[in-house]
Amino acid sequence: MEQEINSVKARLEEAMAEYGKEDICLAFSGGVDSSLLLKAASDAVGKTGKKVYAVTFDSRLHPSCDLAIAARVAKELGGIHKVVSVDELEQEEIRFNPVNRCYLCKKKLFQSLKDFAGEMNIRYIMDGTNEDDLHVYRPGIKALRELEIISPLAELHITKAQVKEIAAGYGISVASRPSSPCMATRLPYHTEIDYEVLERIGKGEEYISSLIKGNVRLRLHKDIVRIEVDRESMEELLERSGEIISQLKELGFTYITMDLEGFRSGSMDVGLDMEA
């Protein structure tokens, strides 16, 4: 296993050494995937005198804590942190949360990133898509391909588990940080996205995460909120249900439930035609 990880790490370093001959623009969330890329890119440009810009989207469709985390981690890893503000809901089609919302959002976000890179005369624009992302419902990947965004982790067939292991080996502070996807994934498709509702959901998730380790999602179905946590955290969720219910009621949620299937990425995609 160690030999395999060392081989994967070497392939990543070799690829980034080539890209590092020029300035690099990286979509940077502060999550483990983009942080590993930033580490590899920073090491590469450190040998060539070029620069790597770690660009974070300031978007209300993403948890507010992400911006502060991204700024801190970018500084730790040697990237030049930049922020690009985007309001996805300016686009009416996105606001009504269609099944291809992820595609539309990615197209809008990464067009903004391309505009930034163009102003800086940067040719290499990257994101942290990994191998595993290619095998689940990720309509946003189509937008990345259309915009010719480079995804080194996916191109090198590096899986999420390998990303985490390599990041931990580098001592990256967010190596075990749970993923933090777009807040629109908390609502059913064809439900109008409302920033006030997403803010309440975000506060609820933040509160539960302060009590329970691991993944936490609040999925809202009209007046029912469905709590997803890792299966090993279910017992603790039940033990602390009184205070959690009280807090969620204060946030305006009516019916509060625990999903017995536990946390699973993309649970709102159940029943979709993935080939559509």
Stretches with model-predicted labels:
Residues M1-G169, V225, E243-F253, M258, ...:
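ATP-dependent adenylation/nucleotidyltransferase module used to activate substrates
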Residues R138-A276:
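AMP-forming adenylation/ATP pyrophosphatase catalytic core
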